Amino acid sequence: DCRMANMIKQYEKVRAFKCSSKEFPELGIVIAFAYNYSDARNLAKGVFNEVNPAVRYLGIRASIVLKDVPKELNNKVCFNENHEGYELVSEFL
């Protein structure tokens, strides 16, 4: 089934997404390590919601900054030097 093959292919590489809030830019930038935009936005939303519960999923801008990061970083977020993966993405923060 072609769709299944595409889904598997889609999940081969973990990417780093630079995420920010359109409505609350003062919240700054979060790097989310995920397979796709949807997961990245959800991760970033979780971080932003700790500071401002009004941040909405649809209000999060995400763009790929790195296309192939170690799989161990999947589902993690990074926004300061204490986080895993910081050395990979510090230039984007």
Please provide the spans of the model-predicted regions.
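A short, exposed loop/beta-hairpin motif centered on an aromatic-Gly-Thr core
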Residues: 26-35
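Small side chains
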Residues: 16-19, 32, 44
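Short, mixed-charge low-complexity intrinsically disordered segments
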Residues: 46-93
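Short amphipathic alpha-helices within nucleic acid-binding modules
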Residues: 39-43
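Compositionally biased, intrinsically disordered low-complexity regions
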Residues: 10, 36-37
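Short aromatic-glycine-(Arg/Gly/Cys) micro-motifs in beta-strand/loop hairpins
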Residues: 5-27
